[in-house]
Amino acid sequence: MSDTIFAPATAPGRAAVAVVRVSGPRTQTAVRTLAGDLPEPRRASVRRLFDADGGEIDQALVLWFPGPGSYTGEDAAEFHVHGGTAVTGALVEALAGLGLRLAEPGEFTRRAFENGKLDLAQAEGVADLIDSETEGQRRQALEQLGGRLSQVQARWREALTEALALFEAAVDFPDEEVPADVAARARPVLETLAAEIEAAAADAARGERVREGFRIALVGAPNAGKSTLLNALAGREAAIVTATPGTTRDVIEVPMVLAGYKVLMADTAGLRDTADEIEAEGVRRARAWAEGADLRLWLVDGSSEETPDLPAEIGEGDLCLITKRDLPVGNAGAWAAEVARRIGIPAAEVTARGPGDMAWLKETLSERVVESLGGGEPPAATRLRHRELLAEASERLRHAIGHDEHVELAAEDVRLAARALDRITGRIDPEAVLGRIFATFCIGK
């Protein structure tokens, strides 16, 4: 790469320290020009920085990383200056005056990828680590950055290479001493690989949920207490609460953390038949969000004296809560028994005003989240991109297994399966895909 890039690696604004990174062939010249000399590699050295006109910029810590032993694999440096915006601005202006270019988002990590310092799956781990908000996200991102998916992919790729060698030998050298039972010898290997890849693809949904959030829907009739419960769980007034049925017209998503995992809790419009066009759209959205949720909490108004109308959508994995048990009217206990009898799942009586009830509910929800996201080993695949490529690879392997009598077709299917796996780590990938992935990074990374 012929040009040299720079960018602030810390967030803009007033702070104790700001870091500006530089990478590329002219890094050494830039450091000498601003700092007066080249510090000892990989040691923080105090230097006074001056621009090209001799004006002092700041007293800074300067770190020099000669390539290829740097993050990007090329000559790189960091300037740690005082965090005032004027100081950072003066340093950025000085670097631009030396002919260096402001980096695009993710360009430092892209250079690391293109110089073989990490593969594409590991680069995605860097992005996930920067974006992590919970312990679950942080741990998963570290696994990705550490090469968990890359190592699994490499093992699969090696096995495919051996199988492909058998098929290609049978095709290219039909008259030589090549085993006649090539397909029979390759079948167990391909079946094992297909099963492992399919399992990883299925488990990728768990990794996606860790990244994006476990989705919990609060569902029920109007005035069942959904908004009140959401506010109690969130610890703030996230939704409007009134005595008027149908107040909630749209899905209100509130992020929170349970057991170290990100959770998206959604208050939804009350489910009922209505002639109101706006409310009807809210009901449609409520049903759609609930259908895609990982867990549904069905709320039944315990203060009502009428037998609850239980929706047919209530399923075995759902939870049912009989709300407003603190009110003197109603039949909360009777409705709990009725729910258990009619739909076969236990129903708990709760009140959003009871600290003990809310503590119990949070603990119960945390257990469900951990059961869904935290069981066993962490998922190798964590993104939709991974899942789609794994599905493509397994499909090709299943085709290859079915081509017992057509070695040429089997070889091509194995080759395409290997190609799909290679795209996970970026060994081959269209430029547009790489650009889209690295564009999600922050500037300076």
Swiss-Prot record:
It is found in: Cytoplasm. Its main location: cytoplasm. The keyword Cytoplasm applies. (6S)-5-formyl-5,6,7,8-tetrahydrofolate binds at residues 21, 78, 117, 445. GO terms for biological process: tRNA methylation; tRNA wobble uridine modification. Binds 1 potassium ion per subunit. It holds the Pfam family MMR_HSR1. Residues 213-370 form the TrmE-type G domain. Its EC number is 3.6.-.-. Homodimer. Heterotetramer of two MnmE and two MnmG subunits. Belongs to the TRAFAC class TrmE-Era-EngA-EngB-Septin-like GTPase superfamily. TrmE GTPase family. PANTHER family: TRNA MODIFICATION GTPASE GTPBP3 (PTHR42714), TRNA MODIFICATION GTPASE GTPBP3, MITOCHONDRIAL (PTHR42714:SF2). Exhibits a very high intrinsic GTPase hydrolysis rate. Involved in the addition of a carboxymethylaminomethyl (cmnm) group at the wobble position (U34) of certain tRNAs, forming tRNA-cmnm(5)s(2)U34. This is tRNA modification GTPase MnmE. It comes from Phenylobacterium zucineum (strain HLK1). The lineage of its organism: Bacteria, Pseudomonadati, Pseudomonadota, Alphaproteobacteria, Caulobacterales. The gene is mnmE.
